[in-house]
From Swiss-Prot:
Disulfide bonds: none
InterPro entries (alphabetical): Ribosomal_bS16, Ribosomal_bS16_CS, Ribosomal_bS16_dom_sf
Keywords tagged on the record: Ribonucleoprotein, Ribosomal protein
Entry GO terms, CC: cytoplasm; small ribosomal subunit
Family matches, as Pfam families: Ribosomal_S16
Matches recorded under NCBIfam families: S16
GO molecular-function terms, A-Z: structural constituent of ribosome
Name used for this protein in its record: Small ribosomal subunit protein bS16
A biological process term (GO) from this entry: translation
């Protein structure tokens, strides 16, 4: 099954997540089909906290990709911020 989930990057104690489309059998930080955004939970000041390509997100969901709970809430947050 194709899923949309977070892949962790960054340094120890300083997480940075890529929002990726991948097969559910692949490792969390492993191979992915497409990177559609990022999430920086430790962003401060003017730093960008969340970027999500809404068109590509909608495309993959229409193709049957299942977003994780966290990605679904981030997508709703991004949609609310742009509206």
């Amino acid at each position: 099954m194709v899923v949309i989930r977070l892949a962790r990057g960054g340094a120890k104690k300083r997480p940075f997540y890529q929002i990726v489309v991948t097969d559910s059998r692949n490792a969390r930080d492993g191979r992915f089909i497409e990177r559609i955004g990022f999430f920086n939970p430790t962003a401060q000041g003017q730093a960008e906290k969340l970027r999500l390509d809404a068109d590509r997100f909608a495309h993959w969901v229409s193709q049957g990709a299942q977003p994780s709970e966290r990605v679904a809430s981030l997508a709703a947050q991004a949609k609310k911020a742009t509206a």
